[in-house]
């Protein structure tokens, strides 16, 4: 990977440098009050201990956005107080074949594009940030999208709720990198969440991760490569340097490119 992030020693084993400083721009260095650069796909972070970090609301909602939150969201929002339906595909009408999850969908660009491109797949979008939820609701209404359900809580709780082996794919795209060492425990990718994803994914299901922050890419690789249930689907450098086919670039991804930061695109298969 770029910048000496991933290296091979003389015996061919992968070596990681996760102690290097990251270049996440405009991050606030105050404990407990971190506001990331504008446009990130995941301005809020949750992890397996049930803790919540970040912000749930930004700019004041416009009148129509507030109306969507009040009237449309209740029809699409998942309530996880009771057991999940089995099969999980029963969440969707009309019937679908597979269910995928996107964690921290931000403005919803990638999730909307995937839902439109795959009408036979059901999508669950997890995003506690109210403004992001309002944006995606506007697109769902405008395009009459029927294969998206939404969850406004802790994604780790959602992973624990879905039946084992019920997800075909999990996407985590440009998550908050929490670049300061003392904040690394706030990153979504932790041993506990990797275990939770392993349980939720079907055999041969995929976890896909995108970030322009080298340190978080190395962190994610280190966690997934030591997980016994995941295989890294990369055979050559272009497999992580270039987006997979038909990938929809997000607003934050375009911003990162303009500022000279190249993203890495990591794919892991559930064994």
Predicted feature locations:
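A short glycine-rich, Lys/Arg-flanked "PGG" loop and its adjoining helix->strand segment in the class I
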Residues: 188-203
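Conserved SAM/SAH-binding beta-strand->alpha-helix loop
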Residues: 129
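S-adenosyl-L-methionine
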Residues: 6-101, 109-118, 137-165
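Conserved beta-strand signature within the Rossmann-like core of class I S-adenosyl-L-methionine
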Residues: 203-211
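Conserved beta-strand/loop positions that form the S-adenosyl-L-methionine
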Residues: 101-103, 126
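Class I S-adenosyl-L-methionine
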Residues: 216, 220-271
């Amino acid at each position: 990977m770029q910048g000496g992030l991933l290296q091979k020693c003389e015996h061919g084993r992968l070596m990681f440098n996760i102690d290097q400083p990251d270049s996440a721009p405009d991050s606030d260095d105050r404990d407990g009050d971190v506001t990331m650069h504008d446009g990130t796909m995941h301005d809020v972070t949750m992890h397996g201990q049930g803790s919540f970090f970040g912000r749930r609301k930004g700019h004041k909602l416009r009148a129509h956005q507030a109306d969507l939150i009040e009237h449309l969201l209740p029809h699409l929002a998942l309530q996880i107080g009771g057991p999940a339906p089995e099969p999980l595909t029963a969440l969707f009408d009309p019937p679908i074949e597979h269910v995928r999850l996107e964690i921290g969908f931000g403005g919803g660009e990638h999730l909307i594009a995937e839902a439109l491109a795959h009408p036979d797949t059901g999508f669950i979008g997890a995003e506690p940030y109210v403004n992001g939820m309002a944006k995606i609701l506007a697109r769902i209404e405008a395009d009459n999208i029927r294969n998206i359900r939404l969850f406004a809580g802790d994604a780790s709780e959602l992973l624990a709720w879905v039946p084992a082996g019920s997800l075909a794919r999990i996407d985590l795209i440009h998550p908050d990198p929490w670049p300061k060492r003392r904040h690394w425990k706030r990153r979504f990718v932790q041993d506990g969440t990797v275990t939770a994803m392993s349980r939720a994914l079907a055999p041969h299901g995929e976890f896909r991760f995108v970030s322009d922050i080298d340190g978080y890419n190395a962190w994610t690789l280190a966690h997934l490569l030591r997980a016994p249930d995941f295989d890294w689907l990369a055979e050559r450098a272009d497999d992580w340097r270039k987006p997979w086919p038909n990938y929809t670039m997000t607003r934050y991804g375009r911003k990162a490119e303009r500022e000279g930061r190249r993203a890495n695109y990591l794919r892991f298969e559930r064994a």
